[in-house]
């Protein structure tokens, strides 16, 4: 008896899941395409769901879980680009959606806004997820200008509805893809690039939780930065050479693809560096300082680092910035759409006195740390998109 008591542990640890449960639900045609691309890229560690009013699109999806929205309302024929139909279709059977979302710690909602199903159903699905206490993040695209004013207005209305029911909203304007793809890029390829951007946004966040790190980030860290934060900015960058971490940081905070937001003024920031075994603390500090100087002085910054030998001499940085003031996110002007080949041939104009360039850029320009290889028209474009444009 005494021996048995002596062998007993002084305390017992309750078993807990090793990782947060993450689900990705693609709504409508755009969201479904994004899920297909994520699966083709062998994006693992998450559960995929697609939901659509169009039965033909559902049958073609490789997703293991499929939801037909509005079977009675639309007869499987789609929403006819009418968001009201998309909304009512999602409301036809909310119990099924809720059942398939249950058990998740985090849900990503992906959709292309402007049409019927994605625009109308996304706020409904987000509201159901929030009712379950799930951290809910929407990653959506906005239409190209050539898709017409009505589609853009519907997208803006969808954005407004989503803002009220998600924890974090990341919006990617398709129009800005014109600044990072070649003029001869076929239309279908341009839409594929939009799907890739959605994939990068979702994977950039989920990897922070799912991939073990030298300095670990976990679901609690991500929840701290993204819960109830509204509009967000997410950027990724890859650097090589002597100032590779600095290079990666500059690319990550200067993405031209994210909707009317920059890192300046952010009050919540999550940073993740990934590099080979030779990644040094001084490199990480140099890159993180770029982000720190651009953010709000009282920003809550959470940092993680992952060793991935497959990267070789490259360093990859992911930054997620949240907590922007409403005034900033609503009034900051959109970036110009430029012809990339033409822009690449032109030297950037000198900044006028009292320039409003980001603090990190002014500082490093004054120190001479920004060499020609990091000129603005180059480092503003994420590496994976430059490769797509080549």
What are these regions (language model features)?
Residues 1-390:
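Tubulin/FtsZ superfamily GTPase core signature
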């Amino acid at each position: 008896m005494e021996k048995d008591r002596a062998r007993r542990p002084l305390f017992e640890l309750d078993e807990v899941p090793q990782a947060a449960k993450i689900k990705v639900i693609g709504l409508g045609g755009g969201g479904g395409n994004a899920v297909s691309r994520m699966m083709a890229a062998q994006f693992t560690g998450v559960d995929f769901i697609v939901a659509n009013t169009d039965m033909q699109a559902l049958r073609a999806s490789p997703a293991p879980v499929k939801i037909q929205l509005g079977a009675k309302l639309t007869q499987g024929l789609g929403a006819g680009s009418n968001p009201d139909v998309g909304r009512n279709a999602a409301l036809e059977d909310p119990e099924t959606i809720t059942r398939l979302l249950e058990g998740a710690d985090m849900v990503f909602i992906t959709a292309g806004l402007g049409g019927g199903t994605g625009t109308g159903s996304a706020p409904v699905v987000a509201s159901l997820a929030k009712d379950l206490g799930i951290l809910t993040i929407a990653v959506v695209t906005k239409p190209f200008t050539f898709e017409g004013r009505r589609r853009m207005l519907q997208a803006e209305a969808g954005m407004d509805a989503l803002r009220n029911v998600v924890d974090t909203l990341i919006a990617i304007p398709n129009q800005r893809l014109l600044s990072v793809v070649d003029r001869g890029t076929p239309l279908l390829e341009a839409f594929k690039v939009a799907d890739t951007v959605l994939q990068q946004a979702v994977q950039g966040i989920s990897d922070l939780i799912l991939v073990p790190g030298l300095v670990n980030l976990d679901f609690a860290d991500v929840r701290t930065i993204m819960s109830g934060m509204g509009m967000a900015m997410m950027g990724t960058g890859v650097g090589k050479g002597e100032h590779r971490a600095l290079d990666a940081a500059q690319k990550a905070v200067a993405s031209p693809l994210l909707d009317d937001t920059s890192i300046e003024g952010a009050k919540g920031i999550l940073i993740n560096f990934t590099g080979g075994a030779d990644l040094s603390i001084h490199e990480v500090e140099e890159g993180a300082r770029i982000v720190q100087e651009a953010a709000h002085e009282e920003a809550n910054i959470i940092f993680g680092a992952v060793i991935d030998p497959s990267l070789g001499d490259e360093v990859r940085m992911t930054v997620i910035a949240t907590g922007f003031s409403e005034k900033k996110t609503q009034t900051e002007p959109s970036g110009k759409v430029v012809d990339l080949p033409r822009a690449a041939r032109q030297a950037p104009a000198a900044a006028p006195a009292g320039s409003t360039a980001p603090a990190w850029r002014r500082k490093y320009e004054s120190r001479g740390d920004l060499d020609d290889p990091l000129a603005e028209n180059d480092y503003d474009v994420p590496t994976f998109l430059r490769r797509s444009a080549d």
